[in-house]
């Protein structure tokens, strides 16, 4: 099963925001320790990580150089980074229009479609409701805490 990490998991997994970062950090530790063999994300999530991480409040903010380095060493070196295949782009827009997807929700629809194209079995996110459209493709949507429970159960 391929786990697909959303931006929220990358952020909390790589930047310590306190106790709420714990589950995402546990997932990233499992990636480092190779306990999760198939983990991926979207190129868009990498861009979103960089955008958010370099404009956080000063106590958490990364410099642009540190943001790029963290992505290089922790994401590109350990995860498979996918983009939406060109052949799927128009279909995404058509489906979004048909579903009434408006505003910034198009970005979540894009990420969900990248996860589908990457054959993800689960999207791990702190924003479950943003990815409910993925359910129609048979992709589970779990919070980091739920995902940790799932992988613990599978190992037992």
Predicted regions and their residues:
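Alpha-helix/helix-capping structural signal
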Residues: 8-9, 44, 110, 129, ...
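Histidine- and aromatic-rich ligand-binding microenvironments
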Residues: 6, 104-105, 127, 139-156
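Active-site neighborhoods of divalent-metal-dependent phosphate/nucleic-acid chemistry enzymes
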Residues: 80-122, 126-128, 155-156
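Short, well-structured N-terminal submotif of metal-dependent ribonuclease cores
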Residues: 1-41, 56-69, 149-156
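Active-site-proximal, substrate-binding regions of enzyme catalytic domains
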Residues: 30, 44, 50-95
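Short loop/helix-cap segments at secondary-structure boundaries that form the rim of catalytic
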Residues: 130-138
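Conserved beta-strand segments of alpha/beta enzyme cores
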Residues: 38, 80, 138-140
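The start of beta-strands in P-loop NTPase/AAA+ ATPase cores
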Residues: 1-3, 121-122, 138
């Amino acid at each position: 099963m391929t786990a697909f990490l959303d931006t929220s998991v990358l952020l909390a997994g790589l930047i310590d925001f306190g106790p709420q970062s714990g589950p995402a950090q546990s997932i990233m530790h499992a990636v480092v320790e190779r306990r999760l063999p198939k983990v991926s994300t979207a190129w868009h999530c990498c861009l979103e990580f960089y955008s958010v991480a370099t404009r956080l409040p000063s106590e958490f903010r990364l410099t642009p150089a540190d943001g790029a380095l963290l992505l290089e060493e922790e994401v590109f070196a350990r995860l498979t980074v996918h983009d939406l295949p060109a052949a799927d782009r128009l279909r995404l827009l058509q489906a979004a229009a048909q579903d009434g997807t408006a505003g910034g929700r198009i970005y979540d629809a894009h990420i969900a479609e990248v996860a589908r194209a990457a054959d993800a079995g689960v999207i791990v996110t702190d924003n479950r409701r943003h990815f409910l459209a993925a359910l129609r493709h048979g992709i589970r949507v779990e919070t980091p805490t739920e995902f940790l429970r799932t992988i613990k159960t599978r190992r037992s």
